[in-house]
Amino acid sequence: MDAIGAYPHRMSDTERRACLRRAVIASTVGTTIEWYDFLIYSVVTGLVFGTLYFPDADPVVGALKAFGVFFVGFTARPIGPVIFGHYGDRIGRKATLIATLLMTGIATAAVGMVPGYDTIGIWGGIILTVLRVIQGIGVGGEWGGSVLLAMEWARTNKNRGFLASWPQIGAPLGTCLANISVLGFGWLSGDQFLNWGWRIPFLLSIVMVGIGLWIRVGILETPVFQRLITDKKIERAPTLEVLKRQPRQVILAALLRLAEQSPGYIFSVFVFTYGTTFLGASRNLLLSASITGTILGSFWVPIAGALSDRIGRRQTYIIGCASVAAFIFVYFALLGTKVPGLMFLAIALSFIPVMTLYGAEAALISEAFTPRLRYSGASIGYQLASIIAGGPAPFISAWLFAAYHSTVPIGIYVVICAVISVVSAALLTDYTNKDTSLEVRYGNV
C-alpha cells in the first residue's frame, strides 16, 4: 500500500493531483509570507535600525548593535522546531503551519509600531528584541512543515527534490517582496522614510497573513502523516526521540547549511550596510540589484531541485558549495570597483550559487529522517544552522571588515564554511529516488 492508500477512500489520480497542487501552492505562498515577515527586518536593519534605535557616534558600532538584535532572531529559531516540530509530528503538518504563520505575522506587524530611541529610549531596542524572538520561533517552526507538506504528497520517488524545492522559493520571493516594499516607500522625500515610511512594509504583513491563512485552511493532511496515524506510529515526544535516535543526522544537517547560510546573509543583509556606509552606494541601487537577484533566484531554486532528482542531492549540493567559495571573491571585487553597473551585477548574480544549495537541501535534509520524526529532526537540524552560520554572518562580516579593513577575511570565512558543508554532504546519506515514506527504510531508528 502506498501512502495515498492510507486515506479512508483511495484517491483518484485527479484528486491526488489536485491535492498535490494545492499543497505545493499553500506551502510556497506560506513560506513566502513568513520569509517576507522575517526578512523585511533584515533589510531594514541595515538601512534604519542602527540610526533609529541605536544612535551612536560611530556608525560601525551602531550597525553592530543593530545586527546583534538581528542575530537574536536566529538564536530563537531552533526553539520553533522544539515546539512546532513536536506538534507537527503528533497532530499533523497542517495545523502547525497555521500556528506558525499567525505567530510570525503578528510579531512582524508589531515591529512597525515600536517607537524609536528618541521617544522611549532603550526600550525601543528591547521591544524589538522581544518581537524578533517571536519572529524567530515562528519561522523556525515553519520550514519543516512547509517542505513536508509539498514533499510528502509526491506519488513517485523521482520528483521529490523538485517538489520539496518549491517551499524554498519562499525565501528569495519573500526577500524580493521585502526589498520591493522598502524600495517603494524609500522614494519618500527627506527623512520621511526614516521617520515613518519604513513602518508600512511591516504593517502590510497583516494583509499577507490573511491571504496565507485562507489558502492553508483548505489543504488536506499529507498522506505520509495520515499513514502514520493509521499505523499508530505517532511518537509521544518526537523531539526527544529524534535527538536520541538520529543525533548524527541532526548535526550533519546543521553543518551542511554553512555554505548556504553564511554567504546568503552576507549577500542579502551585510551588503546594505557595507554598500551604503563604506562604498557610498545609493540605497535604491542596492535594493534594485537585490530585487533582480531574488527574481533570478526564485526561478533557479526549482531548477536546482530538479537537478538534484537527476544527478543526486549530494552532487548538486557539492557543486553549489564550490560555486559559493569561488564567487565570494568575485563578488567583493566587483563591489570594490564602486562602478554602479558592476555592483548591480555582483549583487544580482550572488543569489544563483546560494539558490543552488537552497534548492537541493530541502529534500537532502528531510529525507535523512524517518517519517515519524521527520518534522522535528529536519527542522532542528535546519534551524541550528541559523545560530552557527546565518545569524552571525552579518555580524562576523562587519567585525572582520572593521578589524582588517579588507573583504578578503570575509571571503576566507565563506570558504571555510563551504569546506565544512562539503564534508557534511559527503557524510549525510543521499536518498535520491528511494522510497522514504516507509519506516522500514530507516531500519531500527
Can you annotate each of these PLM segments?
Residues 42-43, 247-296, 389-394:
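Extracytoplasmic gate region of multi-pass secondary transporters
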Residues 45-79:
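Extracellular/periplasmic helix-loop-helix junction of adjacent transmembrane segments
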Residues 90-101, 310-321:
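Cytoplasmic membrane-interface "Motif A"-like loop-to-helix N-cap segments
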Residues 102-121, 322-337:
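C-terminal ends and interior cores of transmembrane alpha-helices
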Residues 161-186, 381-393:
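Glycine-rich segments within core transmembrane alpha-helices of 12-TM secondary carriers
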Residues 171-216:
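Helix-loop-helix hairpin linking two adjacent transmembrane segments in secondary transporters
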Residues 212-219, 416-445:
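Multi-pass alpha-helical transporter architecture, strongest
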Residues 314-360:
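C-terminal transmembrane helical hairpin of 12-TM major facilitator-type secondary transporters
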